[in-house]
C-alpha cells in the first residue's frame, strides 16, 4: 500500500475533529410487524461516534519495550508490541446515546463478558478524499466503563482497548452510517 499524503495545505494543522473513533456492536431487537403477526427477532448492527462532550481524547499506544545493554555498553531496544487504548472522560449519560444505554445495561446485569464484543473504527479524515477517507477497522475490541457519578451531571467514563486485529481501508462518509471498504492486496 502506498503512503498516502495528508489532504491538508502546506503547514496546515489537522483539526482534532478529523480523527474519529466509532464503536460498532450487535444488538438483538424484537419488532412486531405492522398489521399484527408474530414478533420478529433479529440481530442488528449499531454504531456510535465517540467523543460527544469529551474535550480531550487521544489514542495511547502503550508500547511494550525491552531495553538491554550488551557487554560493550551499547543499548538495544526491542519493541515487542503496542497495546493501544483511548479514554473518553467525560463520557456523559446523554439522551439518545445508543452506546451509553448499551453499556449501562451491561453494567446493571454485571455481564462483563459482553464488553469485549466491539468493532472499532479509527477514521483519519485528514487522509484521503471525500468519499474515501482512510480508516482502520479493529475487531474484537473491549470497552470498559470506569466509574459512574459526577458532580452536576452523570459521568460514565469509558476506555476503549483496541485489539490490534486491524484491517485497513476507507469509509465513504464521516457519519455513523458509513460503508467501510477494505484495502485489497494488503499483507497483515
What spans do the regions from the language model cover?
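Mixed-charge, glycine-accented linear interaction segment located at domain edges/termini
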Residues: 138-188
Amino acid at each position: 500500500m502506498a503512503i498516502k499524503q495528508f489532504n491538508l495545505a502546506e503547514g496546515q494543522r489537522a483539526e482534532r475533529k478529523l480523527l474519529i473513533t466509532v464503536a460498532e456492536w450487535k444488538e438483538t431487537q424484537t419488532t412486531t410487524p405492522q398489521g399484527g403477526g408474530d414478533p420478529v427477532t433479529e440481530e442488528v448492527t449499531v454504531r456510535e461516534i465517540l467523543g460527544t462532550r469529551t474535550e480531550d481524547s487521544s489514542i495511547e499506544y502503550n508500547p511494550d519495550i525491552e531495553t538491554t545493554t550488551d557487554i560493550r555498553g551499547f543499548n538495544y531496544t526491542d519493541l515487542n508490541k503496542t497495546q493501544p487504548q483511548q479514554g473518553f472522560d467525560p463520557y456523559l449519560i446523554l439522551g439518545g446515546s445508543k452506546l451509553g444505554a448499551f453499556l449501562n445495561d451491561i453494567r446493571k446485569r454485571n455481564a462483563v463478558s459482553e464488553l469485549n464484543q466491539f468493532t472499532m473504527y479509527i477514521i483519519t479524515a485528514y487522509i484521503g478524499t471525500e468519499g474515501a477517507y482512510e480508516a482502520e477497522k479493529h475487531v474484537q475490541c473491549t470497552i470498559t466503563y470506569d466509574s459512574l457519578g459526577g458532580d452536576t451531571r452523570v459521568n460514565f467514563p469509558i476506555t476503549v482497548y483496541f485489539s490490534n486485529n486491524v484491517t485497513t481501508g476507507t469509509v465513504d462518509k464521516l457519519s455513523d452510517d458509513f460503508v467501510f471498504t477494505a484495502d485489497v492486496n494488503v499483507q497483515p
